[in-house]
Amino acid sequence: QKNNWENTFISLYSFSKSYRLTGHRIGAVITKKERLCQIEKFLDSVTICPNQLGQIGALFGLRKSSKWLKNERLKILNKKIQVIKEFENLSNWKLKGCGAYFAYVEHPFSECSSIVTQKLLSKKAILSLPETIFTPTNKKIIKKHIRIAFANINSSQIKEMFKRLKNFQI
């Protein structure tokens, strides 16, 4: 346990993502009171105010949708588990990190990630993003990592994606 963790802890929560309030920026911040006062000063100085419809949607979600939210969370976690298991069976590809929506992967090819992502799209219809989008421009970067989104596909589509990855060659 880190000493004085309360001096650095900030937790952000997005009602917009949880309750699918697309386009509405509704969220919550948890931190110590003194920091929250400073955050409030910042928010007062920028032009950001969630519209009333988004606020009503978030409040409705909090009051009425906990069962639905629990089921959605389980679906997301099951997809994540499936992706992790599928990568265990995919030779030479290394899963570096897996969240609720994306997998961060090291590919087995000698080409850089920008070329690999282009070939994945043109040959296998898999849209992915090269690591160069997420990292600073630095010649020392390996450039062998890609990010694959899986939140918008179902279980059978995840299986199909891994069949395509298994048979993929540059």
In which residue ranges do the predicted regions lie?
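Active-site pre-lysine segment of PLP-dependent enzymes
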Residues: 1-21, 32
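Active-site C-terminal subdomain of aminotransferase-like
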Residues: 4-5, 34-53
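PLP-dependent enzyme catalytic core of the Aspartate aminotransferase-like
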Residues: 5, 122-127, 136-170
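Generic structural signal for small/hydrophobic residues in well-ordered secondary structure
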Residues: 9, 27, 58, 76-77, ...
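Short, conserved active-site loop motifs that form the nucleotide-linked donor/cofactor pocket
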Residues: 9, 93, 126
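Short beta-strand-to-turn element immediately C-terminal to the catalytic PLP-Schiff-base lysine
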Residues: 27-33, 63
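Structural signature of PLP-dependent enzymes
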Residues: 39-44, 61-84, 113
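Conserved glycine-rich beta-strand-loop-beta hairpin in the small C-terminal domain of fold type I
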Residues: 59, 74-84, 94-107, 144
